[in-house]
Amino acid sequence: MQLTDLTMLELAAKLAAGEVSSEEATRASLTRIQQVDPKVRAFLRVDEAGALAAARASDVRRKSGSPASTLDGVPLGLKDIFLTEGVETTAGSRILEGFVPPYDATVVRLLKEAGLPLVGKLNMDEFAMGSSNESSAFFPSHNPWDVSRTPGGSSGGSAAAVAAREVFGALGTDTGGSIRQPAALTNTVGLKPTYGRVSRFGVIAFASSLDQPGPMTRTVADAAALLQVIARPDAQDATSADAPVPDYSADLEAGVRGLKLGVPREYFTEGMDPEVEAAVREALREYERLGATLVDVSLPHTKYALATYYLIAPAEASSNLARYDGVRFGLRAKDARSLRDVYALTREQGFGAEVKRRIMLGTFALSSGYYDAHYLRAQKVRTLIREDFTRAFQQVDALVSPTSPVPAFKLGEKVEDPLSMYLMDIYTLPCNLAGLPGLSVPCGFTKAGLPVGLQILGRPFDEAGLLRIARAYEREHDFFRRSAPL
Amino acid sequence: MALTLEQVRHVATLARLSLTPEEEQRFTTQLSAVLDAVEQLQSLDVEAVEPTSHATLTSSRLREDVTRPSLPPEKSLANAPAKSDTSFAVPKIIE
Amino acid sequence: MPVSDFQPVIGLEVHAQLLTQSKIFCGCSTAFGAEPNRNTCPVCLGMPGVLPVLNQRVAEFAVRTGLALECTIRPTSVWSRKNYFYPDLPKGYQITQFDQPICEHGRLVIDTPQGEKAIRILRIHMEEDAGKSVHDAGGGQSLVDLNRAGVPLLEIVSQPDLRDADEAVEYLKAMRDVLVYLGVNDGNLEEGSFRCDANVSVMPKGSTTFGQRCELKNLNSFRFLKQAIEYEIARQVDVIESGGKVVQETRLWDVNKGVTRSMRSKEEAHDYRYFPEPDLPPLHVSAEAIDAAAKALPELPRAKLQRFTSQYGLPAYDARILTAERPLADYFEACAGHYKDYKKLSNWFLGELMRLLKEEGTPLSALRFTPAQLGELLGAVDQGMVSANAGKDVLGEMFRTGKAPADIIAEKGLAQVSDTGAIEAVVDDILAKNAGEIEKYRAGKKQVFGFFVGQVMRAMKGKGNPALVNELLKKKLGD
Ligand SMILES: [Zn+2]
């Protein structure tokens, strides 16, 4: 077994015992990246010097018996959407190529304070708009389980890097499923916390009312440990929540006996891959064996979620992306001679097709004469979708469903058909519209060896409950021990 | 609903995107398809429904009126495509 | 139809910069005059990833202003984004309030030749200022300075209740007085920290349908406001008279030419695409907070002016000057606690004190003497212990050194001689030396009397009590 095969907590235990140093772990991670990343292409940028310096500082703390946290010294990767002071951050876009932030995102600061070496920036769909990583302006990442397939998106690079054991864990962001869907497609754990649980300050915005950063790890316990580091109120984020942060590992092993798990009818629909359905149904039976009660529930407005999402998210994005104008940072079109050109040519050359498509859609949805019928109506339907969940959680403790309707698909398969790509998120995006926490945990493989993910959705701020439910399943099925055939 | 080419051009102007003729055509088709798909929302009766603009109903977090250090101008302008002394520079604005 | 057959209709939009230390959504200083982009940070530069957090004083100031202008305060007001591209607007949108502003439905009472008139306030909202672009920077470039970006503003929008340029000026002055009194704004039109746009239209007298309006900008003095409105009224009447139609547009006041001119913007029609700002939760203002703000509200200029005329019996002219600025009014009231001849006190304020303040450029807050000391000085003048003229010198010395009036009078030997015997001796001496002048006086040349007074005062180094000197001279000269 290689060092990089360890989970975060296993490594942390060895670091604490002095059996291995953070520098060794970080070097192992960097070596693994050298070996497999040419195939996986998860990284946009590796910060070897920064990571090793942080690792050595961690080793000094460990030696002096004053680690900064339990995860002190565990190397981590960051989706390239998190601003890192002095380290180029692009959100997968040409328009930010060469942009070196003057400040750290709040979560990056928290990770640094907790002593985690940050080995580099991970590939993503441009501005997190996509479900396959193919909208990255630089190159698509590949799924370690089948490199001809997508690792999912938008946090595809993060999921691929964790699955390929290039890093021990990573941070992603989830606007409509961007943490959970790639986790499901790569046999990893992805947790999207409750909106407001983790600070968005320094996280490049896609859709402000939906975006939420979260952990992407190999195991449920790692996700709990990483969430523990980043979940807290932030004075620099007016939407961050004051709700107390519990100990996420306290009830991890408490099991599901006596819990009521809702199975939403609308999440088992036509178009779902039969093998995905089979794996998920089997997981549901496992929960019954473990003592949980399955309850048939209905979320009647689910069928409107996709339309609602594809009005609200692009509308917010069209405004959030107005700052990329060639004036203060990032790209400015070389041939821009007038102010009008600085704007229109820079944005034309700097944004990719998917980003332009969504800016166009969002601009239209907000424009005079169309606002009421599109944006405002979508916000009202959003209320109905939230109320569906509120009613369901009066009956059950959590909801269980597939994370993605299909396993990893071939790169290039859906690029020319935006609508079929948008359908990849149908089970994940209602959770974002309602601001709820959601988690994807590995629940098996298809015959072709492609991972399948089980999604668990919970009440606001019940991340601990989701982790406990996921862990109960994981204890019986340690799929995370399987390594991808690289 | 089907978008016209004119509408696509108007929206591109609002969004400051200098689309190529091919993009204008492609977006006209693709956006029309998306707008057709979202048309289903029109069938819902939302007359009495309050809109949700924020995912969670947190109360507003405020800050005290105290100054904090600004960035030194060399850092503020470090990423600027064009500058003059400590100002950002753009092609002359014609009013 | 002549101009007099048309009724102008005017509404003003006031933009007042709030007197906070830091910007509305970040900790950068609001100080004026720094090197370009010295007061900027990732937030006000609109860098990727940044989020706004509201400066709570901005909300406090908005509530205070709303209450002073008799507005309804919304318990929950909503932030919106106004989307447009401009180099001095870093994020590509301005954070402002749109359909649910913090204050609505207020009024401000002004004086017109026909008496008092209440101008209705439509709404007050909070927003961030934009930066500054310098267009004539040379080299075919414009330069962008974002020091002003994110400075907090209140926008106060009146209903179109104003009927001529004088009313507009009166309204703007009254508004400035209120904001300055509240301590939320410095009232400086020249520097642009208090500025206004005017919406002007005309309609035939007797009509109830407003004409098409034009928005006037660049009105950075009361004089320009008046001139621009008067010009614009005449222009619109001309357009209508010559069979044309007024086009709704924004027009700039050209200070040099004395005309308003159309800002023929090549920009496409604006579509601001307002929508609720997802980065800022709605602002909640509790009933308790509103009550507390109402209780803490200072007396406003108009109420104070009325009280000064009734309580102190002052003429309206005096009261207006004394209440024009709150510190002066407060100081007057403090002095009135120590000196009861209010009109005489007012004279000293309007005369000597204001002259000294102006000449020395001293703010009232830096005065070195106490209201009790000023009362003491005026008492001494009344009692003849020091002459009115010498009293002015004493006040000057108090102003510069902060010494007590009695000490200054003693040190400088300014005490007035009111001892009849001492004065009589000097009078006798002067008369004895000027027998010829006495002859002239007695022969009817009465102006010689002034000569005697002057001689006596000079001999007494100006300290003789003038009333006594006069009285004794008249007696001795046999009048
Ligand atoms: Zn700032």
UniProtKB/Swiss-Prot annotation, chain B:
Q: Which GO terms describe its biological process?
A: glutaminyl-tRNAGln biosynthesis via transamidation; regulation of translational fidelity; translation
- One Pfam family from the record: GatC
According to its UniProt record, the EC number is 6.3.5.-
Q: Which UniProt keywords apply?
A: ATP-binding, Ligase, Nucleotide-binding, Protein biosynthesis
Note whether Ligase occurs among the keywords: yes
- Broad enzyme group: ligase
The annotated subunit structure for this chain is: Heterotrimer of A, B and C subunits.
PANTHER family assigned: GLUTAMYL-TRNA(GLN) AMIDOTRANSFERASE SUBUNIT C, MITOCHONDRIAL
Protein name from the UniProt record:
Aspartyl/glutamyl-tRNA(Asn/Gln) amidotransferase subunit C
This chain's source organism reads Myxococcus xanthus (strain DK1622)
Name of the coding gene: gatC
